[in-house]
Amino acid sequence: MAGLARGDSRGRPPELPGDLSSQEEEEEEGDSDAGASSLGSYSSASSDTDVEPEWLDSVQKNGELFYLELSEDEEESLLPETQTANHVNHVRFSDKEVIIEEDDSRERKKSEPKLRRFTKILKSKSLLPRRHHKKSSSNNGPVSILKHQSSQKTGVTVQQRYKDVTVYINPRKLTAIKAREQVKLLEVLVGIIHQTKRSWKRSAKQADGERLVVHGLLPGGSAMKSGQVLVGDVLVAVNDVDVTSENIERVLSCIPGPMQVKLTFENAYAVKRETAQPQKKKAQSSTQDLVKLLCGSEADAVQHSTLSIPHISMYLTLQLQSEAAREEQEILYHYPVSEASQKLKSVRGIFLTLCDMLESVTGTQVTSSSLHLNGKQIHVAYLKESDKLLLIGLPAEEVPLPQLRNMIEDVAQTLKFMYGSLDSAFCQVENAPRLDHFFSLFFERALRPGKLHLSGSPSAQQYAAASAVLLDNLPGVRWLVLPQELKVELDTALSDLEAADFEELSEDYYDMRRLYTILGSSLFYKGYMVCSHLPKDDVIEIAAYCRQHCLLPLAAKQRIGQLIIWREVFPRHHLQPPSDSDPEAFQEPEGRYFLLVVGLRHYLLCVLLEAGGCASKATGNPGPDCIYVDQVRATLHQLEGVDSRIEEQLATSPGPCLSCADWFLAAPREKADSLTTSPILSRLQGPSKTAASPTCRRTFFSDYSFKARKPSPSRIGGGREPTEGEESAGLSPHATPDAVRKQRESEGSDDNVALLKLARKKSTLPNPFHLGTSKKELSEKELEVYDIMKLTSGPENTLFHYVALETVQGIFITPTHEEVAQLGGSVHSQLIKNFHQCCLSIRAFFQQTLKEEKKKALSDGEHSEPTNSVSSLSPVKEHGVLFECSPENWTDQKKTPPVMSYWVVGRLFLNPKPQELYVCFHDSVSEIAIEMAFKLFFGLTL
């Protein structure tokens, strides 16, 4: 399958145009792809009809590649409205800049329909390079969105270099000319005289062709009639087809009939004037490229507001090399360069003193400190390695201290994965632009987490910002549970890729060692990992790299036309030195490791390759091999029909059902009608007419109001007295589960059975107290399905949110964005924020427990006899916090607003393997974390 898919992406051998209609249909199918399938590929051993891939020019000198091509819709939204109305733009993204290449393809399709037929013929003859958009078809050449503002005249200098001239060409002139040995179509059809240099006639460069310099114009020719072609101009393209002296005759011979043809010329004098400018342009390139892509039109405002916030990252040395005092000699790197960060930079001596003094006094390394700057509290995290110190400072109101400690560990892990060590990253001057780019994205994620979420839904942005406090630094990847048959299909596709025993990847194909060994791969869809064949350590490091470079939120929306990343990496799992204690343990080969990431639409496929060992040894700085890129891209093309089934799993996740916190805040009886007809309940309950009837309405929780109670950590709730006009059948949700069960079972309703079936489809319960009324009427099978969906104990569902971390496999599961968006509600959104911040603090206790357990294990190994050391506190394995909340906008001053209580509980499991569970549920029931964890973790495998 992979071989067939790959064959479609290769260039076709030249053939004479047959049925043009069939060819046009065939080409239109290829052009309808998202931009990635239309790109050709090539290899050194392939035929000369293959075309260079578009990303080849973006490979850096050190072999790295970061190429991003947006989808057509996103390309249009990237430029101002005045330009997007008439242009379709292609974006070429490298490590240092984003370049928009404008193209008048829309107008050309309308005004020049004959050109399409001409283009199809050229494609069928493999004369049309797939990168023909590189030359701008408008008067504006390539424009960098990083170097110009939208209000500036971005094409002033480029207009002097390129110009488009439309001329009329009639191939029928050839029939009027007597047959001669050599007919120069450039002179006969266009009227341009080009004299080939004698040194080119028998030169090896003749195969690549010579630049078509205009040496003269034929009187009466099309070029002279246009009045725009001058002697000295260079013809670079015909209808966006790159031409040289080698292929100009073949390109002109493909013109089917009389038509208008666009000629692109380059002014030779402008080329000479701009030869000295490339180095200056590189120096002016910005490091905010991905931020502009992610934030869109708000990029400038976001970046300006970010720079006004005091934040900094510094890499300092503790040992000065010379006695002579030199200003800032201890600073090896710092970012950003702004007025707000300058104040933090000026007090770096305090950080150095604390790091040195506390370690000498206490014997432990300093991890964090706090200071006040202009009335704002700033947290600073420390990470010391040998005689170097990494510092990251962020405002306390934006980033809590436990999160900052996790963030600096995550940054250090990612930089070591990219460069091998912190010294290699910060002490090499050529890495400075890449580090600026890295920390630019890092601070944007830290200070504006909601801005980088590409969904237009405000609830999704709020959830992304609230959950980033905890989820972004968990030692795991967000996992999406899939059905077994779908999981097998994904596993098969990745296994076929990793086998690498077909076509060019086979050693028998060239009778030589393959270049790389594929160690494994991981597949992401919309930021969720759906399949992985990599060890836990590799998965965590690769996911951290993608997260730090904002690739996961980028793939969450269909913005990727094609993404190709190639770089050498240093995975800790493979490069750690072997232990001397076990000589029979597996020894990793001495090789080099490379990461290949290919993105297409919502997919992101990460492949880890090894050079050395079974494969050939890598020398120098190898760039990406086109064959491997094609095979990975072909694997993604095989999954084109799978994305719809994954979308179904996102919409109806098989995870446990959730309840909305707003449902538990009772409204007055006179407001019950408005609550039961709210968009949230109507969307989840469906078009049930009985939901608004009086007999059914009394079963809604909104008809029952709480009896106001003082804040208390007690989990024993009291009943309430029925208010005037209400039936005494109403229950307080703080009543015991037995009382709820007895009274609910006495109120049966056939309508609730249909509601339960609807809830199974939507994976969220419309109202937690709307389902228990008819449990005795459900069949045994329906009860079993209901119990599987409901994680909490008791007759009703009281689960609000959860996070389950499986540290052995490096994954965690949590409700999807779609599930949280369905619940909505102002109280529930605040609950989500409180949940993640509280879990962050609870996990800090668990991390301390794990450190103590490791120390205990080491001490037990060194001392066979039990030690008499007594710890002041027992290891924390379960921790809970009780919250109470009331409606924000409570207008009835005569009545006390209702109060809802909920618990946030975290549980650490050390045996049989480390696991962490965090749940949020209503105070009306008592939950056992072990039972909930068993339901969540049972059968959870990669």
Swiss-Prot record:
It comes from the Eukaryota. Residues 137-156 have a biased composition (Polar residues). GO terms for biological process: cell division; cilium assembly; embryonic digit morphogenesis; establishment of planar polarity; hair follicle morphogenesis; intraciliary transport; keratinocyte differentiation; limb development. Gene3D superfamilies: 2.30.42.10. The keyword Oxidoreductase does not apply. Residues 1-56, 128-156, 707-751 are annotated as: Disordered. InterPro entries: CCZ1/INTU/HSP4_longin_1, CCZ1/INTU/HSP4_longin_3, CCZ1/INTU_longin_2, INTU, PDZ, PDZ_sf. SUPFAM superfamilies: PDZ domain-like. Residues 22-32 have a biased composition (Acidic residues). The modification Phosphoserine is found at S674, S678. GO terms for molecular function: phosphatidylinositol binding. Keywords: Cell projection, Cilium biogenesis/degradation, Cytoplasm, Cytoskeleton, Developmental protein, Phosphoprotein. Plays a key role in ciliogenesis and embryonic development. Regulator of cilia formation by controlling the organization of the apical actin cytoskeleton and the positioning of the basal bodies at the apical cell surface, which in turn is essential for the normal orientation of elongating ciliary microtubules. Plays a key role in definition of cell polarity via its role in ciliogenesis but not via conversion extension. Has an indirect effect on hedgehog signaling. PANTHER family: PROTEIN INTURNED. Belongs to the inturned family. This is Protein inturned. It comes from Mus musculus. The lineage of its organism: Eukaryota, Metazoa, Chordata, Craniata, Vertebrata. The gene is Intu.
